[in-house]
Amino acid sequence: MLQTGIKGTGEALVTEELSARAMGSGELPVYATPAMLALVEETAWKSVAPALEPGQGTVGTKLDFSHLAATPLGRKVRCETRLTEIDRRRLVFSAEVWDEAGKIGEGTHERFIVDSEKFLAKADAR
């Protein structure tokens, strides 16, 4: 059952592929903001997926996030999300991301519940 308070946890190892240099968001070999945001989205959707009806999925619609500190290559990062609000099909999550030295990111993320087949048909029709 979908209810507020659902928590999720995700982890990643910061590799060259997840660096700002490789992702094009900067020139330095540190954890890229786009990689951190992807980890937040993945952690959030996976946390609520078991509570959805068959045929439903979620799509990300909004991120309001601060990247607080740089993480060098080779470190592990951990994301924790919590579902804080449900407004019909809109889901709001709080999220925090840490590396081994401390918090590196925090913010909110919104997703919408969709009927997967209808959503894909509408996307294909665009």
Where are these regions (language model features)?
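Catalytic strand-loop segment that frames the active site of acyl-thioester-processing enzymes
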Residues: 1-32
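Hydrophobic beta-sheet segments that form the core/acyl-binding groove
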Residues: 65-100
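Residues at secondary-structure transition points
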Residues: 27-35, 92, 114
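Hydrophobic residues in beta-strands and at strand termini
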Residues: 14-16, 67, 113
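Hydrophobic beta-strand-centered segment that forms part of the acyl-chain substrate-binding groove
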Residues: 45-78
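C-terminal binding/interaction regions
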Residues: 2-9, 86-93, 99-126
